Every structure is written in C-alpha cells, then in structure tokens.
C-alpha cells in the first residue's frame, strides 16, 4: 500500500515538473510588446522583428473584430454566429513558440488563439494570416470539434463575408499553394 502512495506521489510530482518546465520554456521565449498600430500589448517571440510581429497581430485583430461584428449584424440569430460573437475575444491573440508540431490553433473554443507568425524566419503575409485566423474563427463558432462538414460550411461563409467587406482578398491556394509555418496551404472552402 505504501509503495502505491509513493509511486502515485512521484507520478504527480513528475507531471507538475513537466508542466512547469513547459511553462518556463514557453514564457522565457515570449515578451510583451506594444503595437504601434493600436497601442495594445501582444505576446510575441523574443526576436529582432518582435515589433513587426506585434503589429501583425494588431492588423489581423482589427480584421477579425470587423468580421465578427459584421457577421453578428447580418445573422444575429444564427447559432454559429451567436457562439462566435460570445466566445471570440480579440484580446487573446498571441504568438506561439517555434514548434514544428503546431501552426496556429484555438484553445477551448476561443479561450486563447495561438498564432504562428513566421515562415522560414520571416513574418507571414497578412492575407495568409487572415485566412488562417478565419479558419480559427470557424472552430470557435462551430459546435463540434474538428473539421466536419458544418465546420467547412461555416469557414466558407466567413470567407465569403470577409471578402465582401474587404477583410480578406480571395486567393486560389490550389493554383498557387502557400507555405505556412511548416505546412502547405493547398486549398480553401472557396475552391
């Protein structure tokens, strides 16, 4: 019985240690920078272009706020739009650490939106980042997890409206794939 308690304690302490190590690794490579675009604080990687990274997040933040507000204005009773409006917090956009396993992702349907901002060491194009962020908005608004048909339909709807209001410029990823953070974007729901 005593051995089980000791084993259990060691396992719990190991998990806590691994978590703290991850937190240290993450936050030791991240700094908070004030964007010149909107004077807001953004968490970005400690790199020479950190100011540019903060400004890039500020630019995409503005586009996403416009899109979410537009969607709520034209479809205020749509369940996905209502969920998106409720759960989207533009103040949780931040850059993630360099990790080939992750590009951009949403935590708990909008609790955090972690962005990959660099491909091959250079800041990504704002239109590509906007496409990726609209993909993340689709996850926030969609009730299910993953990429089911409802997700793709909502993603397409958001892209169409983003184009209509000038937030996103349509791009044919099938014709000209784009490298984004260790992966290739090869298609879009609009194709």
Predicted regions and their residues:
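Walker B catalytic acidic pair
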Residues: 136
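Active-site-proximal or metal-binding-adjacent scaffold patches in catalytic folds
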Residues: 1-130, 140-191
């Amino acid at each position: 019985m005593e051995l089980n308690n000791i084993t259990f304690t060691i396992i719990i302490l190991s998990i806590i240690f691994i978590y703290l190590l991850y937190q240290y690794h993450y936050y030791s490579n991240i700094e908070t920078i004030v964007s010149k675009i909107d004077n807001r604080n953004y968490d970005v990687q400690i790199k020479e272009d950190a100011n540019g990274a903060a400004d890039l997040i500020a630019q995409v933040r503005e586009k996403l706020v416009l899109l979410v507000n537009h969607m709520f204005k034209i479809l205020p009773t749509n369940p996905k739009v209502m969920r998106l409006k409720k759960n989207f917090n533009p103040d949780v956009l931040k850059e993630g650490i360099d990790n080939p396993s992750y590009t951009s992702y949403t935590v708990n349907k909008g609790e955090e939106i972690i962005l990959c901002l660099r491909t091959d060491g250079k800041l990504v194009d704002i239109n590509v980042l906007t496409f990726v962020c609209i993909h993340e908005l689709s996850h926030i608004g969609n009730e299910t997890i993953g990429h089911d048909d409802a997700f793709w339909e909502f993603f397409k709807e958001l892209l169409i409206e983003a184009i209509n209001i000038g937030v996103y410029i349509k791009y044919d990823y099938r014709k000209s794939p784009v490298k984004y953070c260790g992966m290739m974007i090869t298609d879009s729901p609009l194709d």
